[in-house]
Amino acid sequence: GAMSSADFGYVLFKEFLNFDPDNPDWFDRDRFVLSAGHESMLLYSLLTLAGFLNMDDLKEFRQWGSRTPGHPEHDMTPGVEATTGPLGQGVAMACGMATAEAHLRGKLGSDICSHFTYALASDGDMQEPVAYGSAALAGQWGLGRLIVFFDSNKIQLAGPTDRSDCTDYPQLYRSLCWQVIEIDGHDHGQIREAIKKAKKEENKPTLIIGHTTMASGSATLEGSEATHGSPFSPEEIKASKEKIGLPAEEEFFLPSEAITDFQSRFPELRERASAWKDRFKKTMDNSPELLKYWEKIHAAPEDRQISWPDFDPEKPLATRKAFGSCLNHILDQVPNLMGGSADLDPSNQTVHFRNECGIFNGDNPCGRYLPFGVREFPMGGILNGLALHGGIVPLGATFLVFSDYERNAIRMSALQKLPVLHVFTHDSFYVGEDGPTHQPVEHANALRTIPNLNVFRPADANETKKCMHIALTQRETPSALLFTRQGLPVLTRENYPRLEEGVDRGAYILREADGPVELILLASGSEMHLALKAAEILDKKVRVISVPCMEIFDAQPEDYRRELLPEDVSARFAVEAGDDTAWYKYVGTSGKVFGLNHFGASAPAGVLAEKYGFTAEKLARFIKDNLK
């Protein structure tokens, strides 16, 4: 892997990659994504030659607290653009970065934004459907500044690729509207010419297929899958060094002349970065509107000032429709909001977004709407790439039941601390007639198990806009926003004065008991209205708690959590139209949860609610029976 890709990596970094040697975060740098994250030592070696890492960092490879973890992590190592390792996703994130570059070039002009995105992919990357789906979109969108090097050594962890793959990649990628160039991946002259040709193609992304040899340069293991994940023996290391012409006894060896040669282009790179700063100042001095846009897209998320629509308390509204109204309301206020739906525009309420902001493609780079097609996982990876690039607020939508398709990209949003908005509508069995394949059961709680992910399930339109505000003001936490298909009553500030401040804290008392609290009933989303009605039926003093976001509530000071859930009230119940496991941390082992721990069925939503007991009367009966 790392040895078969080394020639491409070396030529790219030494001769082509545009970056500021003194500032790895310079806005107009080229991006390089190592999709083949298991080849991390190649990237670390190149970053050492570039001066971002040092020899001590290399000696700490894969050790606790080092800047050289086993797979690259973008927030840990300067010069690492994306956290990679799960194969294929680096290609998706590179596609997202190239999309961001093309869009911002259209908005800011090429004097301010004009760079390339490179990715290095392995045989395993290319086999992952997420790479294929992203490549299809890159071709559709005409991302001419996306260049992927395919290290085709025809070996993967378990053996030769021909045991499991008969894909004709040149033909496949040509059919996806890519330029394809095939070369000897070890010939520096061919690599050089391929990159030059790729950079000249303005309307198509380029796939450079480098035919390479696994473990190229090793003494006896060239072409062997044994080298994929296992270190060389001491004897093989010694013999390989002798073959290449390196001092056999030196464990780590980097002569100063190698650094000098590698960095020979640095004066030119510094000059380019300096010239960009001059252009930037001149452009912004002469264009107040452009400066305003720049400041807005680079403002800290927590400083965003956003106004939201008002909702008619007399008209029930599905939270997905409330989301749609909120989205439409903020399009001008958040001018760098970019994203779309996985072919569910009407259902996800993104049609106005599409029509108002225009579809992004090569002919319309200023368009902000991304029609992802039925590609949930590529969508998630591309959203991460948009966020990693910077200057973009990414949003993607689909049905909650299909969050499983997108799950690992959502996990990578959380791991990389990217404030992506993952929107999921049709959040329970109330989907109705489409049946169990489209009715989420375990999905909300499955998302809640992902660290550093806020999962919002608002109870009405007003909680929805508050949840969206929180999501849009996060610096390092992505959000999963879960919305209903069915209409829900609108909770008003007059009747529920704690609502706005309460959502900020993840959970709050929506209805207080009349007197000393005898029973606590927790709920989220559509079941909040069920809980309010059941509380009226019960002949107990009931406190009803709305829990739109468990993660935010769990992070509150202990005093606030005890205030809502006093220890002396053991009669605790929760209701949610889905798997019940997450709620026991609130109700305790003596409490009960009214949930849904089985698959749904095809029938009208009202019929299913009756059959499954999701009525106020049956919830009240469940509580009474369990109090006995």
Give residue spans per PLM region:
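Short beta-strands and strand-loop turn motifs
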Residues: 119, 149-152, 423-425
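Short acidic, Gly/Ser-rich segments with clustered Asp/Glu that frequently serve as metal-coordination loops
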Residues: 124-130
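Flexible, glycine/proline-enriched loop segments at strand-loop-helix junctions
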Residues: 83-84, 121-124, 179-184, 225, ...
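Structured loop/turn residues at secondary-structure junctions
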Residues: 35, 122-123, 186, 375, ...
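Generic enzyme active-site microenvironment
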Residues: 120-121, 149, 209, 341
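Thiamine diphosphate
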Residues: 1-116, 264-266, 270-482, 487, ...
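Terminal amphipathic helices with adjacent charged low-complexity linkers/tails
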Residues: 27-28, 206-218, 222-301
